[in-house]
């Protein structure tokens, strides 16, 4: 691909980004990313987050979901966040930087969490996309499997789970796996999710334990 094509593509992305009403609204409201509107819409429909809850936020950086979760759970609740990327501190959020796929990082995260005491696990994780679907989809599915494994280790009975999943190979099997573990499972495509994106959010409540 030529430099001109790359530059043109980058230019279009930047223009779309800065013209995006959700980007502008996030900046106006003091949130770190437009992704906050995805969890806000899920919350408005499904009421996952309540005062006093303990929440685990996977793939948290730059922190939009954690910001929103802290507002919902209040001073009596807690948010434990993890990402491979750095994240500026947020009051009320315990942040661990590291690769969630590494056992040492997972162990460090689990040390901050009491077993069976987490009310909500939420994951907005996504791999670095190469543009090659045959490579990207398995990477994405691996991450959502890890998020589901986290539920098995820390989620309280009747707890909730929301996870970003890319539609494609492995999606149907994963959805069935989630349905086996939770009483109610819904698929959401938030308004703020770009129409061309394959992403959807699985929202699962009533963890069977």
UniProtKB/Swiss-Prot annotation:
One of its GO terms (cellular component) is cytoplasm. It is found in: Cytoplasm. CDD domains: AdoMet_MTases (cd02440). It is an enzyme of class 2 (transferase). It comes from the Bacteria. It catalyses: uridine(2552) in 23S rRNA + S-adenosyl-L-methionine = 2'-O-methyluridine(2552) in 23S rRNA + S-adenosyl-L-homocysteine + H(+). GO terms for molecular function: rRNA (uridine-2'-O-)-methyltransferase activity. InterPro entries: RNA_methyltr_RlmE, RNA_MeTrfase_FtsJ_dom, rRNA-MeTfrase_E, SAM-dependent_MTases_sf. The active site is at residue 164. Its EC number is 2.1.1.166. Gene3D superfamilies: Vaccinia Virus protein VP39 (3.40.50.150). S-adenosyl-L-methionine binds at residues 63, 65, 83, 99, 124. Specifically methylates the uridine in position 2552 of 23S rRNA at the 2'-O position of the ribose in the fully assembled 50S ribosomal subunit. NCBIfam families: PRK11188.1. Belongs to the class I-like SAM-binding methyltransferase superfamily. RNA methyltransferase RlmE family. This is Ribosomal RNA large subunit methyltransferase E. It comes from Aliivibrio fischeri (strain ATCC 700601 / ES114). The lineage of its organism: Bacteria, Pseudomonadati, Pseudomonadota, Gammaproteobacteria, Vibrionales. The gene is rlmE.
């Amino acid at each position: 691909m030529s430099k001109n094509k790359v530059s043109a593509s980058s230019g279009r992305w930047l223009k779309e980004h800065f013209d995006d009403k959700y980007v502008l609204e996030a900046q106006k409201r003091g949130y770190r990313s437009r992704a906050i509107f995805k969890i806000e819409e899920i919350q408005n429909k499904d009421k996952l987050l309540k005062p006093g809850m303990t929440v685990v936020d996977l793939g948290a950086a730059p922190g939009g979901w954690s910001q929103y979760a802290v507002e919902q759970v209040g001073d009596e609740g807690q948010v434990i966040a993890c990402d491979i990327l750095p994240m500026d501190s947020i009051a009320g959020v315990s942040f661990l930087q590291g690769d969630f796929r590494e056992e040492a990082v997972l162990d460090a995260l689990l040390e901050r969490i009491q077993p069976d005491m987490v009310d909500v696990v939420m994951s907005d994780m996504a791999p670095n996309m190469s543009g090659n679907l045959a490579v990207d989809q398995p990477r994405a599915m691996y991450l959502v499997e890890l998020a589901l494994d986290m539920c098995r280790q820390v989620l309280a009975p009747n707890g909730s789970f929301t996870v970003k999943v890319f539609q494609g190979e492995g999606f149907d099997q994963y959805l069935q796996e989630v349905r086996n573990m939770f009483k109610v499972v819904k698929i959401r495509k938030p308004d703020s999710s770009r129409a061309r994106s394959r992403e959807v959010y699985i929202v699962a409540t009533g963890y069977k334990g």
